């Protein structure tokens, strides 16, 4: 992307007010450009879209990705937009102005999750990312677990890289009252830290239980309750998103219902990845 933008901005080439980033296999709703432009014209220098998927019904893996991105669009970015906070760029289907590009000194985002890096870099600069709910993009999701594992492993490493690079500036923004900085910090907080904390707490509880003469059956029941609680929490999130975005999901009704049940399993596979 950096090389392309440098070529576009060579002397003698046309000047562009903004740039739209898309993957070659993305399919756009007929009104995509006009909907993105509405938000851009409202004053947002960076705009992201409603990220849908064209292969939701392939299997539980593609559906897991797709449902997460629908939830991200409707219940994270849409909520942020309503609250006046900054939204977050996710993968593809986003616009940024030439002014933003100049402020950044070009596209200098080379971490494993450059979309998140770009978002955080602009949030700490004081920019807000807008969300165009009517700009619908259809993306293709992985269908094999091996491919999904490698991709999400890369994302997890990328989150760590971004957190390491921007943590101090995010915390400084939080100290100065920036809700967007707080929100983005929670968005990129390394899952490994949260998972590690959970493991330490549970191991500590197991040791305490054994020391005090507690039964292993009680410990096993406690672990089972924790897993079921996590499953039900994720299941509810998946069901709510499935119901509200029902008409946007491109697959049969039976698969929509089935994949609401497999969504928690997909999300729980993040634990060993992180």
Task: Report residues per predicted region.
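Long helical/loop segments within the catalytic core of UDP-sugar-dependent glycosyltransferases
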Residues: 2-16, 30-112, 149, 153-164
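Active-site-adjacent helix/loop segment of glycosyltransferases
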Residues: 149-187
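Active-site donor/metal-binding and catalytic loop motifs
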Residues: 133-147
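Catalytic donor-sugar/metal-binding loop of nucleotide-sugar-dependent glycosyltransferases
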Residues: 84, 119-137
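The conserved acidic donor/metal-binding loop of glycosyltransferases
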Residues: 23-27, 110, 122
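Short aromatic/hydrophobic "clamp" motif used to bind/position activated sugar donors
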Residues: 19
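Acidic donor-binding loop at a coil-to-helix junction in glycosyltransferase catalytic cores
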Residues: 112-118
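Membrane-embedded multi-pass helical conduit in multi-pass membrane proteins
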Residues: 187-274
């Amino acid at each position: 992307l950096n090389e392309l933008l440098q070529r576009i901005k060579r002397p003698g080439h046309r000047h562009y007010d903004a740039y739209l980033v898309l993957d070659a296999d993305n399919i756009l709703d007929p009104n995509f450009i006009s909907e993105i432009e509405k938000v851009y014209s409202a004053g947002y220098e960076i705009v992201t879209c409603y990220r849908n998927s064209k292969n939701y019904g392939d299997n539980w893996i593609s559906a897991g990705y797709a449902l997460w991105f629908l939830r991200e669009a409707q219940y994270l970015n849409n909520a942020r937009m309503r609250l006046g906070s900054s939204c977050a760029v996710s993968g593809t289907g986003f616009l940024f102005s030439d002014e933003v590009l100049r402020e950044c000194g070009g596209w200098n985002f080379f971490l494993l999750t450059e979309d998140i890096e770009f978002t955080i870099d602009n949030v700490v600069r004081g920019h807000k990312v807008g969300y165009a709910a009517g700009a619908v993009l259809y993306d293709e999701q992985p269908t094999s677990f091996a491919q999904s594992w490698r991709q999400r492993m890369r994302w997890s490493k990328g989150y760590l890289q971004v957190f390491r690079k921007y943590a101090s500036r995010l915390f400084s923004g939080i100290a100065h009252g920036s809700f967007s900085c707080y929100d983005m910090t929670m968005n990129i907080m390394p899952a490994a830290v949260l998972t590690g904390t959970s493991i330490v707490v549970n191991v500590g509880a197991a040791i305490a239980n054994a020391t005090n003469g507690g039964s292993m059956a009680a410990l096993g029941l406690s672990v089972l309750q924790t897993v079921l609680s996590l499953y039900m929490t994720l299941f509810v999130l998946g069901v709510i998103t499935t119901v509200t975005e029902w008409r946007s999901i491109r697959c049969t009704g039976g698969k929509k219902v089935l994949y609401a049940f497999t969504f928690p399993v997909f999300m729980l596979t993040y634990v060993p990845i992180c």
